Amino acid sequence: MTKTIAINAGSSSLKWQLYLMPEEKVLAKGLIERIGLKDSISTVKFDGRSEQQILDIENHTQAVKILLDDLIRFDIIKAYDEITGVGHRVVAGGEYFKESTVVEGDVLEKVEELSLLAPLHNPANAAGVRAFKELLPDITSVVVFDTSFHTSMPEKAYRYPLPTKYYTENKVRKYGAHGTSHQFVAGEAAKLLGRPLEDLKLITCHIGNGGSITAVKAGKSVDTSMGFTPLGGIMMGTRTGDIDPAIIPYLMQYTEDFNTPEDISRVLNRESGLLGVSANSSDMRDIEAAVAEWNHEASLAYEMYVDRIQKHIGQYFAVLNGADAIVFTAGVGENAENFRRDVISGISWFGCDVDDEKNVFGVTGDISTEAAKIRVLVIPTDEELVIARDVERLKK
């Protein structure tokens, strides 16, 4: 038995989960927030308890030190060296990293070079790796990429219809995201259906504040909705998803809101989607509450959101030449039963149908009617477990 920790480092946060492997038992989990700011918050959850402390944490190295000391303080481990492996989520692996990789040689430098593709994420992910390397230099460190699962896409799916030089010189292509989640729920869907993953065609829908949909054939991603960045694809909580690119130069010319690249990124990534259309909230719970009060903008935002998701699911029926199941996961996908019902009701002619008695909050598994030809599944995602499994697989 070994202890492995899965890490998701953000620019000012550190989310973690400690596993006993190979049993895959969660021993503890936690979150450190406001790194680099005053009144940082460290939360540790274990054995049904939740312990929190407020202190000033200057950087990721100090955050990792506090995390490790808390594990000892709460008697979860006796010493640092009980942890034999650490896995780090990294958003962008580009074309270079096609699978999870042990951190050695120039791996970390390559991760930092790929910050051009994920400037908000990769630098923070790399900071988390460096912090653990400093404090636990002798254990196996593994980087697990959101994009790796999508490197199986054929060229016709990942290339954009731009002049070739922008691909060869600037690496402009579809990379996708949420790959670890799509990979996990595809595997769980095969177990639930009692069929080999290699025999299945699945449409996996990771729908949270950010969202993406993936066509999975024989366990491999063959197309996905997010593109060069996580801005592409379906409408999301605060992101536009796909729009006509000509809108950008038009608004640059005729408004004061699009003067710089930073302005463009802010509006498209943080001020659009459900939030932008509803002028209310990016949270599906707030949107549904406003819809119930006959709020027109919220109703329109909800209808647009469902519409874009239905269109992408339909598109992937064409890509896969049919599907065996549609899988919902992540915050909205797992918890918003009205949303699932409305998405499926609009594409029921494919042969999918939701049983209202099964489609309730908190229920997971197969929510289809008995007569449905295509199964509709709700499967909680577990990206941290995928990371822990990859660490175990790659340990020396």
Swiss-Prot record:
Pfam families: Acetate_kinase. Its cofactor is Mg(2+); Mn(2+). Mg(2+) binds at residues 8, 383. It catalyses: acetate + ATP = acetyl phosphate + ADP. The record marks 178, 239 as: Transition state stabilizer. CDD domains: ASKHA_NBD_AcK_PK (cd24010). It comes from the Bacteria. This is Acetate kinase. It comes from Streptococcus pneumoniae (strain JJA).
